[in-house]
Amino acid sequence: GQGSRLGYEGPKGKFPVGPVSGKSLFQVHAEKVLKYSRKYGVDMPLLIMTSRANHEETEAFFRDNGRFGLAPENVLIFPQNMIPSIDTKGKLILETKSSVFKNPDGHGGSLTALFTSGALAEMKKRGIETISYFQVDNPLVKIVDPAFIGFHVLRNADVSSKAVKKAYPEEKVGVFVRFSSGAIGVVEYSDLPEEKTRSLDEKGELSYSSGSIAIHLFRRE
């Protein structure tokens, strides 16, 4: 994503977060991948989803910095897909008289982009079975968590997620919910009705208290 929310012009991953080192978010994550690759004796790839606005700049940043020690084949940068935009009345927004305005399809589109970009096929070819997913603006994320991965594998899960308890009802974080179909998913805080945001269970705790921190494991298949 773009770094506008951080007051930074350019890809969010280029934002410097090291108070002394000045390392960028991209460098922090790349060095973690390199460290764990050496620790476990494997070639662990770093996959980065970009948008049209920052794809080329992201590629150039990694290239100009020697991919922070990672081999070229272990840095896979792919663009997310674009979808038509609509206004509040559900009507298509035009970019020009003959073209529809489009926007990136968001975090959820990462799974589709992994497929359409050929990244999933590359992972299958390399025997990679588990995908560790996190947001670029989380420098503290434990990208390789043995306990989390072990639990995911033991349960033979398709998806595993980490959650944190909400600090207060209005905290701006998506929450895990169980839909009427029985499926579990994440509802953004902006989409959760106010009465459900403040709803309490029989113990007096928030009914929707499990906040999503966008750390997931996916089984490749």
Which residue ranges define each predicted feature?
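Domain-scale recognition of functional cores that engage charged ligands
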Residues: R5-R220
